[in-house]
């Protein structure tokens, strides 16, 4: 009897525990159904239809009947503002198709545009395509005789020098009826030249002509292109208005062949050359950098030694202090010409307190066979301690006009052995 009572009590306790466990499982599943995101009460019917179809498709994949919510939680996708809904047959709604990559109607033109400014995408913004101002046709210096535009190209294979004569502007002509022409020389050959057509009754002639010089590749970098602009009067006599000297160097012939070059006309020096020739150069002093700059431009009327085989002519520039040698630089050599053109720049370090004791010596030398050099002429510029006359005036003008290039001609004096 006692054993039967014990079995009965144990069965009752086991049944209660089983009932409690089943109740807990049902409670957890019942609570899980309320953890999903709740949709708003006033929803768009199209939105409800959209999610109903979404739910039906989910049931098909998960195997859960439509009348029962799946046990796997899901997240409601965000609503897309601004989408258009179109009605379908049967009372359903669908989203109208849209471009997956919508293009903005307007976009800012530039970073500096105002908040209200906008331009259509695909349109050209002219501010982005503005070319830099061409300053070649403005800024004519005082006393300018005119300006000439031209182009130079050298064809290595055919050894031809192509020169394009483009135009001239601001020519200073003696009369209103201006008729101009241009003669082209390839120095040092002064005898042969090419000539442009005469432009009548115009002070800003447009030539647009091409000329060809046959010159070897070995000597082209030693040549100088000379443009002489003439006024033709009623008697057909030629009056020189100005000239341009353009050295043909390696850096000039390299690069873009269609680059347009312009130069201001220079007056021809009518003074006869001195006994040993003349040299033209510029001086400039920068007191802030303590830098003395020398630009060797050209020489003329050099007395070459005919009894020797001439190879080339160059200029040696020496900086002296208290008549003691400090530093020396030299130009490139020009094939034996009595009128060589250099256009080369040199700089020397000179303190301000040394300007009263420093001087510059420029010597023109002729190189012969065997690399022997013979002086052709010499000039010294500096303070009163070393020079007089034009050489002293040139030095003084350089000091009065700091950071400016002061250009002058100087007569070469008797050479001394270097």
Swiss-Prot record:
Pfam families per the UniProt record, alphabetical: C2
Subcellular location, principal: membrane
Membrane-spanning segments: 5-27
Keywords annotated in UniProt: Membrane, Repeat, Signal-anchor, Transmembrane, Transmembrane helix
Extracellular-facing ranges: 1-4
Domain of life, per lineage: Eukaryota
C2 domain residues: 144-261, 275-396
Gene Ontology CC: membrane
PROSITE patterns: C2
Record's subcellular location: Membrane
SMART domains associated with the record: C2
Expressed in which tissues: Isoform 1 and isoform 2 are expressed in heart, lung, skeletal muscle and testis; not detected in brain, liver and kidney. Isoform 1 is expressed in spleen.
Cytoplasmic topological domain: 28-418
Membrane topology: Single-pass type III membrane protein
SUPFAM superfamilies xref list: C2 domain (Calcium/lipid-binding domain, CaLB) (SSF49562)
This protein's domain notes: Neither C2 domains mediates Ca(2+)-dependent or Ca(2+)-independent phospholipid binding.
Similarity comment text for this entry: Belongs to the synaptotagmin family.
Subunit description: Homodimer.
Role summary: May be involved in the trafficking and exocytosis of secretory vesicles in non-neuronal tissues.
Protein name: Synaptotagmin-15
Originating organism: Mus musculus (Mouse)
Species classification: Eukaryota, Metazoa, Chordata, Craniata, Vertebrata
């Amino acid at each position: 009897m006692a054993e039967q009572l014990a079995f009965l009590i144990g069965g009752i306790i086991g049944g209660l525990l089983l009932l409690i466990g089943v109740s807990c499982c049902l409670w957890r599943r019942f609570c899980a159904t309320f953890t999903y995101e709740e949709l708003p009460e006033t929803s768009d019917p199209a939105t409800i239809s959209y999610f109903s179809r979404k739910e039906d498709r989910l049931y098909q994949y998960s195997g859960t009947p439509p009348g029962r919510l799946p046990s796997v939680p899901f997240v409601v996708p965000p609503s897309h503002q601004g989408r258009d809904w179109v009605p379908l047959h049967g009372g359903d709604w669908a989203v109208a198709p849209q471009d997956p990559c919508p293009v903005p109607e307007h976009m800012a033109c530039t970073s500096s545009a105002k908040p209200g400014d906008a331009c259509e995408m695909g349109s050209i913004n002219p501010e982005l395509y503005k070319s830099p101002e061409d300053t070649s046709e403005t800024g004519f210096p005082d006393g300018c005789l005119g300006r000439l535009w031209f182009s130079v190209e050298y064809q290595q294979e055919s050894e031809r020098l192509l020169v394009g004569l483009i135009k001239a502007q601001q020519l200073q002509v003696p009369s209103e009826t201006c008729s101009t022409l241009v003669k082209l020389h390839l120095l040092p050959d002064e005898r042969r030249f090419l000539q442009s057509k005469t432009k009548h009754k115009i002070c800003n002639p447009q030539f647009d002509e091409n000329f060809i010089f046959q010159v070897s590749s070995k000597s082209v970098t030693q040549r100088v292109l000379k443009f002489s602009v003439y006024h033709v009067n009623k008697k057909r006599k030629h009056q020189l208005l100005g000239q341009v000297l353009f050295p043909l160097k390696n850096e000039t012939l390299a690069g873009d062949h269609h680059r347009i070059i312009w130069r201001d006309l220079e007056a021809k020096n009518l003074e006869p050359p001195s006994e040993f020739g003349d040299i033209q150069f510029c001086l400039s002093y920068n007191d802030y950098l303590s830098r003395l700059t020398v630009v060797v431009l050209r020489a003329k009327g050099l007395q070459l030694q005919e009894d020797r085989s001439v190879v080339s002519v160059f200029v040696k520039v020496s900086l002296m202090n208290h008549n003691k040698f400090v530093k020396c630089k030299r130009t490139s050599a020009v094939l034996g010409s009595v009128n060589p053109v250099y256009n080369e720049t040199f700089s020397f370090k000179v303190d301000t307190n040394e300007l009263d004791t420093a001087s510059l010596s420029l010597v023109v030398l002729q190189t012969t066979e065997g690399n022997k050099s013979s002086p052709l002429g010499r000039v010294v510029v500096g303070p009163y301690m070393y020079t007089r006359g034009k050489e002293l005036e040139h030095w003084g003008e350089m000091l009065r006009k700091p950071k400016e290039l002061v250009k002058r001609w100087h007569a070469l004096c008797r050479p001394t052995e270097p």
